Amino acid sequence: MSYTLEQADILIDLAQQTLRLPKHNKFYLISSGKNGIGEQENSGKTPRGWHRVAQKIGHDAAKYSVFIARQPTGEIYNQQLAQQFPQRDWILSRILWLDGLETGFNQGEGCDTFKRYIYIHGTPDTEPMSIPMSHGCIRMKNDEIIELFGLVP
């Protein structure tokens, strides 16, 4: 199947570290994978290509809600929690779980975005945007991921 930019709900520019919603005229800064760009399993890289939002997680979650394995922990992120768990990869507020649409590139054996658990998700607001720092996911500020969550199908 072939896709066009006109069909896209979300456009991510990894070189510019931006996410656009053309249909809503919205623009956000992001942080992608610190290991660079790529589709390989266990690479820590952010995948390229056509994707869809497979699952939206956290519909009614409070801002700064903490998720582990896509489940709310009951915790609300704050500095004390950050100091208690300094090595935790914080997934906050909302999760958009991505699924690749290109067999052999970002879907299937060894490269599957969905099976790699690649999300668009909230991160602590103290984390910088425009600098690749994630483990492969797309990180956003919490107010912005909450807004995005409400705008995409």
Predicted feature locations:
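Extracytoplasmic
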Residues: 5-7, 14-16, 25, 48, ...
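Exported/periplasmic cell-wall-interacting domains
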Residues: 63-153
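Glycine-rich catalytic cores of cysteine/serine-nucleophile enzymes that process amide/ester linkages
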Residues: 14, 22-51, 57
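N-terminal post-signal-peptidase region of extra-cytosolic proteins
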Residues: 1-9, 29-43, 75-82
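Soluble periplasmic/extracytoplasmic beta-strand elements of cell-envelope proteins
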Residues: 9-11, 29, 52, 95-97, ...
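Short linear motifs in intrinsically disordered
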Residues: 2-13, 147-151
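"…centered on the first transmembrane helix and the immediately adjacent amphipathic helix/loop
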Residues: 56-57, 62
